[in-house]
Amino acid sequence: MQTRVVLDTNCLLASLSSKSENFRVWKDFQEGKYTLCVSNEILEEYQEIIAEKATPNIAQNVVRAIVESDYVEFIDSHFHLYAIFADPDDNKFVDCAFAANAAFIVSEDSHFDALKTLAFPKVLVLKLKAFLKYLENRD
């Protein structure tokens, strides 16, 4: 069974360019080296932020590639954990990770540090560099 992962939007964005040191994150997803877990809310944020930071066309292509991938798991979380108070918008990633029983969330966002202090839900958060090291060690 593949490792289930939730990617924060900025980590996904940082991995899209083939010239990026983080490109392996996107490439390994496309090659099925892990399963990307997403919800409709997460896909909407991917679309919005990538369109804003890159172009609407790139955003559409990225979201289409995710939706059509064999290595994506669509999660419909019927509950909200409200684990992050500093930025409630980040809770969609926590809810998705918890519902998917994901190994971790990949994020550079310090708001996710709040998860370290919670007894429940237990959701591991990796920084992008740590996730890259994880991918390298799996080879």
Put a short name on every predicted segment.
Residues 11-12, 42, 111-112:
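Alpha-helix capping/helix-boundary segments
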Residues 40-67, 134-139:
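Extended, non-globular alpha-helical segments
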Residues 7, 17-19, 23-51:
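PIN/NYN-family metal-dependent endoribonuclease catalytic core
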Residues 8-9, 38-39, 108, 127:
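A secondary-structure boundary/capping signal
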Residues 110-139:
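Acidic, PIN/NYN-like endoribonuclease modules and their adjacent C-terminal/linker elements
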Residues 72-105, 110, 114:
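Active-site neighborhoods of divalent-metal-dependent phosphate/nucleic-acid chemistry enzymes
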Residues 28, 66, 96, 117:
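Hydrophobic/aromatic ligand-binding patch that stacks against planar heteroaromatic rings
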Residues 2-4:
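Extreme N-terminal starter segment of soluble prokaryotic enzymes
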